[in-house]
Amino acid sequence: MHVFDNNGIELKAECSIGEEDGVYGLILESWGPGDRNKDYNIALDYIIERLVDSGVSQVVVYLASSSVRKHMHSLDERKIHPGEYFTLIGNSPRDIRLKMCGYQAYFSRTGRKEIPSGNRTKRILINVPGIYSDSFWASIIRGELSELSQPTDDESLLNMRVSKLIKKTLSQPEGSRKPVEVERLQKVYVRDPMVKAWILQQSKGICENCGKNAPFYLNDGNPYLEVHHVIPLSSGGADTTDNCVALCPNCHRELHYSKNAKELIEMLYVNINRLQK
C-alpha cells in the first residue's frame, strides 16, 4: 500500500493500516536506504492535510522502527512528542510535518537522546484517538481516489468516476470476483470504476477485437469504447480486468448478437493474454 498525491499518482511512500503493540492507526515506512520511500516527506504532508480536512485536529505519533520497538518496550517512551497529543492545526501541513519530523531526531536506534541529530524520516505509527476504521485511513492514503474508486450500480455515477480515473496513473485493480447484486425493476450489478477505467486506459483508444480506433471522442476528450464482460455478470462473471475488454460499439454488438459469438469470444482468449476463463 502506498500514499497517493492529489492527482491520483502513487508516491514512493509505503504504508499500511493496522495495529501494532495494541495501537491502531496508519504506519508510514521510513525513508531509506537510498531511494526507498523517497517521497516520505511529501506523503506526510498529504496525510496531515487530509487528516485536517477530515476534522482531525490532534493525533498521537509513535516511533515504530523494529530497533526502537526492541529496545524501548514502553509505548509512552516511543511517543515522539512531549504532550499527550500532537496538534495538526495552526500551521501549514509542511510546517507541521517539519515539527513532527524534528521530534524524531531526538531518538537513536536504541533510545532517546538529548541532542537532536540524524534521521528525521523514521518508521512511525499515527494514531487518531477513537478511530478504528480501515476505510477512514484508506481515504487519508488515497485522497479523492478513495471516493472515485468505490463500486456503484449507478451507470451515470460510474461513468463520471471513470472519466476522472482514466486521467490518473492507475495500477491494475483487483476488481470483484462476485459483484454485488442490487434488485430494482431489473437486476443490476455494482460495478468497479477502477476496473472500467483501467481497461479503457490500457486500450489506448483501440478496440481490442478489431484493432480499429474508437469511432469518436467524448466531451471529456476520451475515446469512446465500451467495456464488455467476456463472461457476463449475469452468468456469474467477475468484474475484474481478466474478464473485461474494450470494444468499439460494432464489435460489442457482434459479441452479443452474432451467430458466431462463441468463436469470437474464443479468439479474445487467444489474443488477449490477461483474459482468464
From Swiss-Prot:
What does the UniProt keyword field contain?
Endonuclease, Hydrolase, Nuclease, Restriction system
This protein's record includes keyword Nuclease = yes
> Gene3D superfamilies of this UniProt entry?
1.10.30.50
What EC numbers are recorded for this enzyme?
3.1.21.-
Domain of life of the organism encoding this protein = Bacteria
GO MF annotation: an example: zinc ion binding
An example of a Gene Ontology BP annotation on this entry? DNA restriction-modification system
Q: Does the keyword Nuclease apply?
A: yes
The record places domain HNH at: 207-257
Q: What does this protein do?
A: Restriction of 5-methyl and 5-hydroxymethylcytosines at the specific DNA sequence 5'-C(me)CGG-3'.
- PANTHER family noted in UniProt: SLL1193 PROTEIN, TYPE IV METHYL-DIRECTED RESTRICTION ENZYME ECOKMCRA
In its miscellaneous comment, the UniProt entry states: Encoded by the SOS-inducible cryptic lambdoid prophage e14. UV treatment leads to prophage excision and reduced levels of McrA.
Tell me the protein's name.
Type IV methyl-directed restriction enzyme EcoKMcrA
| Encoding gene (name) | mcrA
